[in-house]
Each structure stands twice: as C-alpha cells, then as structure tokens.
C-alpha cells in the first residue's frame, strides 16, 4: 500500500516540476521578447518580425551614436578641430580634459579638470587617496632627503613643528 502512495507522490512531484519549468521558460521567453517597456507581439510571419526587430535595433544604435556625439561635443569639421589643437598645446595636455560643447565657460572646464590621473593631495574626482583607490599603492613616508619631503608644497610651513627623529641624533 505504501509503495503505491510513494509512486503517486513521485508522479505528482514530477508533474509539478514539469509545469513549473514550463512556466519559467514561458516567462523568460516573454522577457526576452520585450523591447524597452512594451511587449513585441509575435506574428505568424517570422521574417517580417525579424526584419522589423533589425530595423529597430539599427535605429536605436544610430540614436545612441548621435547622443554620444552630442555629449562629447564633437564637431563635423574635423580639420577645424585639429587646427585648434595645434595652436594650443600647453600645460593642459597632462590633465584629463573632456571637451564640453560650451568651451567659453571656464568654470565648467575647471570642474571637469578637477579629476587628475593619480591620487595625490587632491587627485581623482576632488578627493585625495581614498580606500577605494587600491591600484595606487605606495610604501614608506615618501619624504626624506632625496625627495625633498614637502618642501615647496602647500602646508610645508605648518608641518615643520612636527619633527621625526632619526636614530643618528642630528638635531636640526
């Protein structure tokens, strides 16, 4: 008697498993056929459907490229832009400057230039070396006789009161 019940229970579990996997597959098919927020209706003609989908993808790609061009401030006259670059090769080439559409706005350029390549006293996006910036690892005090310590840098005068002792007893 118990063997019969276990067989029925196993059959019921198998049916539940089949139904749940079928429902999950149907859900994933519905999700994969979505474009944006609307549902693409499936037609009997698959060729027309695939052509429409390809056209939509091409349109979306073109719109994204146009948007990227507008964001980066690229001009259609490439020659004019290169002439301007030849005239103005100065101290800005070591900074990461993003070309904005309104180049006359100096404040916007300063804000963009705030992000430098390395993490110094004020590097990155405004902040100095933070814990998230693990790629820049430095050892030691990075001061000393050869490097010059903080001489000629901001805050050098304030830091002279704190003297570190070297073992040789030279008093400065």
From Swiss-Prot:
Keywords: Antibiotic, Antimicrobial, Coiled coil, Immunity, Innate immunity, Secreted, Signal. Residues 109-172 have a biased composition (Basic residues). This is Protein nemuri. Its main location: secreted. Residues 1-25 form the signal peptide. It comes from Drosophila melanogaster. The keyword Transcription does not apply. Detected in the brain where it accumulates in the dorsal fan-shaped body following sleep deprivation (at protein level). Expressed in the adult body. Disruption phenotype: Adults display disrupted sleep. Consolidation of daytime sleep is decreased, particularly in males, such that the number of bouts is increased and bout duration is decreased. Adults are more easily roused from sleep and have impaired sleep rebound, thereby recovering sleep more slowly after sleep deprivation. Mutants infected with S.marcescens or E.coli at zeitgeber time 18 (ZT18) show a significant reduction in infection-induced sleep during ZT0 to ZT2 the next morning. It comes from the Eukaryota. Antimicrobial protein which is essential for the homeostatic regulation of sleep. Promotes sleep following sleep deprivation or bacterial infection and increases survival following bacterial infection. Likely to promote survival to bacterial infection in two ways; by contributing to the innate immune response and by promoting sleep during sickness to aid recovery. Induction: In the adult brain by sleep deprivation (at protein level). Up-regulated after bacterial infection in the whole adult body and in brains of some flies. One of its GO terms (biological process) is innate immune response. One of its GO terms (cellular component) is extracellular space. The keyword Thylakoid does not apply. Residues 27-172 are annotated as: Disordered. It is found in: Secreted.
